[in-house]
Amino acid sequence: MAIVGIGTDIVEIGRIEAVVSRSGDRLARRILSPDEWRQYQQHNQLVRFLAKRFAVKEAASKALGTGIRDGLAFTQFEVCNDALGKPSLRLFDQAVVLANRLGVTGMHVTLADERHYACATVIFER
């Protein structure tokens, strides 16, 4: 397998907290898929949940080589977790088109968070 894209993003959790304080759920609705939105509403650490999802989606958009633009939206990426909490990624719409163009057959996601930051790396391979 060959790496066809890699992206990393780091998010200052305090910045996400400030946006949520100012605008309520607007940011969450802009970046979360419907399934993520349901999880978000039941989560006990809303800001941390949102910051981690944001970091993964930014990293994934960078791995596709585009960033969030030209028809690519945060909601076209969905972060899922297995029973042990290991993150994975589902793609929709334009994200699928771009991944297919690159010949993506495998995806890897790593996610870390500490007190002030959330960091994610996404690798696409073929």
Swiss-Prot record:
Its EC number is 2.7.8.7. One of its GO terms (molecular function) is holo-[acyl-carrier-protein] synthase activity. It is found in: Cytoplasm. NCBIfam families: acpS, pantethn_trn. Belongs to the P-Pant transferase superfamily. AcpS family. The lineage of its organism: Bacteria, Pseudomonadati, Pseudomonadota, Gammaproteobacteria, Enterobacterales. It is an enzyme of class 2 (transferase). SUPFAM superfamilies: 4'-phosphopantetheinyl transferase. It catalyses: apo-[ACP] + CoA = holo-[ACP] + adenosine 3',5'-bisphosphate + H(+). Its cofactor is Mg(2+). One of its GO terms (biological process) is fatty acid biosynthetic process. The keyword Ribosomal protein does not apply. Transfers the 4'-phosphopantetheine moiety from coenzyme A to a Ser of acyl-carrier-protein. Mg(2+) binds at D9, E58. GO terms for cellular component: cytoplasm. This is Holo-[acyl-carrier-protein] synthase. InterPro entries: 4-PPantetheinyl_Trfase_dom (IPR008278), 4-PPantetheinyl_Trfase_dom_sf (IPR037143), ACPS (IPR002582), Ppantetheine-prot_Trfase_dom (IPR004568). It comes from Sodalis glossinidius (strain morsitans). Keywords: Cytoplasm, Fatty acid biosynthesis, Fatty acid metabolism, Lipid biosynthesis, Lipid metabolism, Magnesium, Metal-binding, Transferase. It comes from the Bacteria. Its main location: cytoplasm.
